[in-house]
């Protein structure tokens, strides 16, 4: 797996810091992990696919050596972010190997076909929609809400306790442009990401006197592995939805992962 990122456009020293990145083998979060690692942090990637994480870690490590002439500490851990006991067990291992958490990036998330409508808007004629709001699968809705919202809340509960004692720490939640402006089709995903934004605001207040910072970023549109089929046809040409997105984007293109570093 080849990962290509630009050189870090800033100089920050994170030596002695431990960063945990959930969803760390994904397109966007692996770019963020790279930025943390070449800045000196020890990085723990959390994901569900061990083989994919190994490929990402190998690529990031090699690129850091080639482009930055730096030796990095990046390790992978398989964990279910919606299972608190799994998170607790994983954190015990991370803490023993890399130290307690200083930086947490909550990037685990995703969508499910059963939680997406086929049409962007309800047809004028009743009964002509292939898969409308009323057809959404209850189980898939719960899965999307759990992965995105609970998969953000639970890691914060588990990984940030040590920050309180240190009176220092940074939590960065990955929301979405759909947190602010609900997008057509992806009703459940938009609601889950909106919940993350509200959670972030609540935690920023709750942690306000503790030295722990909690912020969120709301990325726009990026061509990533999980949305590839939504944005591109089998021949590589953009889908009508992709063309519509680009037409409504001032820069006239999708974002690049390294722009989030």
Regions found by a protein language model. Name each.
Residues 10, 117-124, 209, 221-249:
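A glycine/serine/threonine-rich, flexible loop-to-helix segment
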Residues 25-26:
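Conserved glycine-rich cofactor-binding loop
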Residues 41-56:
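Conserved glycine-rich Rossmann-like NAD(P)H-binding loop of the short-chain dehydrogenase/reductase
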Residues 115-133, 137-142, 245:
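Substrate-binding pocket helix/loop in short-chain dehydrogenase/reductase
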Residues 156, 192, 200:
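Active-site helix of classical SDR
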Residues 161, 205-206:
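Alpha-helical segment proximal to the catalytic Tyr-Lys
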Residues 176:
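Residue(s) in the substrate-gating loop at a strand-loop-helix junction
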């Amino acid at each position: 797996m080849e990962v290509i990122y630009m050189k870090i456009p800033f100089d920050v020293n994170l030596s002695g810091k431990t960063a945990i990145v959930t969803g760390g083998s994904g397109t966007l979060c692996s770019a963020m992990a790279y930025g943390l690692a070449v800045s000196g942090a020890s990085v723990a990637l959390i994901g569900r696919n061990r083989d994919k994480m190994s490929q990402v870690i190998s690529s990031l490590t090699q690129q850091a050596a080639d482009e930055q002439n730096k030796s990095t500490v990046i390790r992978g851990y398989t964990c279910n972010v919606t299972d608190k006991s799994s998170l607790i067990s994983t954190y015990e291992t991370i803490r023993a190997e890399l130290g307690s958490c200083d930086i947490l990036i909550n990037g685990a998330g995703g969508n499910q076909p059963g939680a997406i409508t086929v049409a962007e808007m309800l047809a004028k004629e009743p009964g002509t929609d292939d898969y409308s709001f009323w057809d959404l699968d209850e189980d898939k809705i719960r899965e999307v809400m759990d992965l995105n919202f609970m998969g953000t809340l639970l890691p914060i509960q588990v990984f940030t306790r040590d920050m309180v004692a240190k009176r220092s720490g940074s939590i960065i939640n990955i929301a979405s442009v759909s947190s602010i402006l609900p997008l057509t089709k992806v009703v459940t995903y938009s609601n889950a990401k909106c919940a993350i934004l509200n959670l972030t605001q609540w935690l920023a207040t709750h942690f306000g006197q503790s030295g722990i910072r909690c912020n969120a970023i709301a990325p726009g549109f990026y061509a990533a592995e999980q949305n590839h089929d939504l944005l591109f046809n089998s021949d590589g040409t953009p889908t009508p939805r992709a063309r519509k997105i680009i037409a409504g984007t001032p820069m006239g293109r999708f974002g690049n992962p390294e722009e989030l570093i």
